Amino acid sequence: MPDSGNIQLDTLQHKDHSQETTSHYEGGSQLPEQESLDTNIQDDSVEYPGLIRVILITMGVALCSFCVGLDNTILATAIPKITSEFNSLEDMSWYVSAYLLVTSAFILSFGKIYTYYSVKWTYLISLGLFELGSLICAITPSSAGLIVGRAISGLGSAGLFPGSVIILSNIAPLHQRPLLTAFIGIMSGIATVTGPILGGVFTDRLSWRWCFYINLPIGGVTAVVVFLFMKTMKVKKNVPTSQKIKGLDWIGTAVFIPAIVSLLLALQWGGARYNWQNVRIIMLFIIAGVLGMVWLLIQRWKKEEATIPPRLMQRRSVVGTCIYTIPFVGCVIVLGYYLPIWFQSVKGVSASQSGIMNLPTVVGTIVVGLLSSVLIMRVGYMMPFLVLGSVMLAVGAGLCSTFQRSSGSAEWIGYQAMIGMGAGLGYQLPLLVVQADVPAADVPVATAVVIFMQNLAGSIFSAIAQTVFQNQLANSVQILAPSVNPESILDGGTVDLSDRFPSDVLPSILQAYNTAVTHTFYAGVAAASLSVFGAFIVRWNVSVKKKVPPEPLVPGGSHSGAERDSKNGT
């Protein structure tokens, strides 16, 4: 007897395309159903939760996304106090790197774990790891303990990133997910922007340890909500444990982790700790390249047991979203990082004031993100919104590249609003595209791939922007203020410039900073423009409203992968 608090799914002939359940080897040979996957809806007797449960679960997951977003940026204003307390200036970069490296290294692995094991319990275990890491960071008496805690939190966040999106696919049909996904993305975006402000408040008023204590009660609320209100769907247990373990691709993971760690270390250290020609950076890139090629060969060899099954990357929309995501998110990262630097260095405001001046971007993202979600729920198609998001983001970045020292509030408010609208249109859509395009059994891996690309974009474009900024700043200082040593500029930071330089050279220094920052926005313009090509690769008819009959699961009645793609317009 169905629970009265639940909503019955549509009839069998109206199931979402995202609820397909058949997987195939290359060439069309059939694989066993992956019926252990929570998101793999088997028949029309399965029920989605009722409205109250959907709201509670979404709010719980959104709170967790807020915590994860905070952890990405909250230490920006707290690190000086931490290094002073621990007397550990040499460890400073590891407070951020330990978290980022572990998160990026394990995101794809969690995509496979979510494929074979309960979404609910995998998410709760990931949340437990994140909370444990936060607790260690909050109470640690040493710098080493803080680094270990950050690494453990990073491992947990690797499961929370894709888990949040996968949970939404468990609690709502595809055509209702745009609004839920937008809400999750907005909470994460707000946390990313407000993180440095909260970090400064905690550090000045309480203690830097509250940057981590704050995660404990919020994560606790999420854990209670998910545990009580999210049900593990009934599925047939016909996948042997040995096959599940084998399907986690241990060989591929063992090669992928050192490959991605080498790449990220090269991107983080290059131009900062060492110059790009340093033998350490060159060797890291070589190691990353060689291991990356080995990993690709392993994926081809393992086929369906690979971390990313090759057939998944043969789908136009998956490839398109990856090509779209890297430059699009890269542009958002560059603008999000260097707009506050422009406010603080050129306009001379404090960190908290720069956060307030950054609100037009936040408001634009929230408003347009919600409005576009409602529109997508009505029209279904997403490709036009991807293109429009890229265009608006590129225009906004281009307008910001015209900033001058004399630029007034009308300019920086209006230009940021354009950036926010572009980000609101395109940031979360790739996650919906892959959910609408791939079979349900592939949703966890496809989701993890997109989120991994988002993380990778941050590392790549942060390194590019940092190189552009530092080189342009040094060149501008040599031209505009030849009496000033460029090294002292680079080592001194971007704040309190009026206190560090005499009045006769200060205008030249401010102009040099303005030139350096606006040149980084050129990289944002190029990135946003490139993302348009990815949007056009995505199939135009991928829709959150499109209903197709499920493929037959009996031998002789199933379609080959190529036939299925042809039917769906791939």
From Swiss-Prot:
A family per Pfam: MFS_1
Where are stretches of biased composition, namely Basic and acidic residues? 561-570
| Chain positions covered by the region annotation Disordered | 1-34, 550-570
Q: Where is the composition biased (Polar residues)?
A: 1-11
- State the InterPro entries in the record: MFS, MFS_dom, MFS_trans_sf
Keywords for this entry?
A: Cell membrane, Glycoprotein, Membrane, Transmembrane, Transmembrane helix, Transport
Q: Tell me if Magnesium is a UniProt keyword of this record.
A: no
Glycosylation annotated at which residues?
A: 541
Q: Which PROSITE patterns match?
A: MFS (PS50850)
User: Any stretches that span the bilayer, and where are they?
Assistant: 50-70, 94-114, 121-141, 151-171, 182-202, 210-230, 247-267, 278-298, 323-343, 356-376, 379-399, 413-433, 445-465, 517-537
* Broad class of where this protein is predominantly found: membrane
Q: Which family does it belong to?
A: Belongs to the major facilitator superfamily. TCR/Tet family.
Q: What is the protein name stated in its UniProt record?
A: MFS-type transporter ptmT
Q: Which organism is it from?
A: Penicillium ochrochloron
